Swiss-Prot record:
UniProt family annotation: Belongs to the profilin family.
Gene name for this UniProt entry: PFN1
GO process terms (BP): actin cytoskeleton organization; positive regulation of actin filament bundle assembly; regulation of actin filament polymerization
CDD domains associated with the record: PROF
Post-translational modifications reported in the UniProt record: Phosphorylation at Ser-138 reduces its affinity for G-actin and blocks its interaction with HTT, reducing its ability to inhibit androgen receptor (AR) and HTT aggregation.
Predominant cellular place of this UniProt entry's protein: cytoplasm
Name the UniProt record assigns to this protein: Profilin-1
MF terms in GO: actin binding
Subunit structure: Found in a complex with XPO6, Ran, ACTB and PFN1. Interacts with ACTB. Interacts with VASP. Interacts with HTT. Interacts with SH3BGRL. Occurs in many kinds of cells as a complex with monomeric actin in a 1:1 ratio. Interacts with ACTMAP.
InterPro entries recorded: PFN, PFN_euk, PFN_sf, Profilin1/2/3_vertebrate, Profilin_CS
Gene Ontology cellular component list: cytoplasm; cytoskeleton
Length: 140
């Protein structure tokens, strides 16, 4: 799905994000486009299944993983009409910095963004939501 790389380029253009991905979640979940060599390119079908699954209760206790990166769930509105967003933060290992992540959902895709160190989660959320809104208008 090479055409999706332009969406990744657009999401990364202003320099506030360190990672981005477009993931198809219907039928056979897979990464359609992502920043090469970063975390989201490694997202597994099992991780996608957990993200879009009906069981939302364990997120806040256990967190979840994206591309093998452990994350804490801050706010889960992914399955709520009109919102379709989930805000997360990476878990620190060995005192490393943590980063804000937003996941937004469309009819066929998940849009994922990870901000750079010090970038406010609200900025990432807004950018991710706007891309998802564009994809929804384009029937994705």
């Amino acid at each position: 799905m090479a055409g999706w790389n332009a969406y990744i380029d657009n999401l990364m253009a202003d320099g506030t994000c360190q990672d981005a991905a477009i993931v198809g979640y219907k039928d056979s979940p897979s990464v359609w486009a992502a920043v090469p060599g970063k975390t989201f390119v490694n997202i597994t079908p099992a991780e996608v299944g957990i993200l879009v699954g009906k069981d939302r209760s364990s997120f806040f206790v256990n967190g979840l993983t994206l591309g093998g990166q452990k994350c804490s769930v801050i706010r889960d509105s992914l399955l709520q009409d009109g919102e379709f967003t989930m805000d997360l933060r990476t878990k620190s290992t060995g005192g490393a910095p943590t980063f804000n992540i937003t996941v937004t959902m469309t009819a066929k895709t998940l849009v994922l963004l990870m901000g750079k160190e010090g970038v406010h989660g609200g900025m990432i959320n807004k950018k991710c939501y706007e891309m998802a809104s564009h994809l929804r208008r384009s029937q994705y």
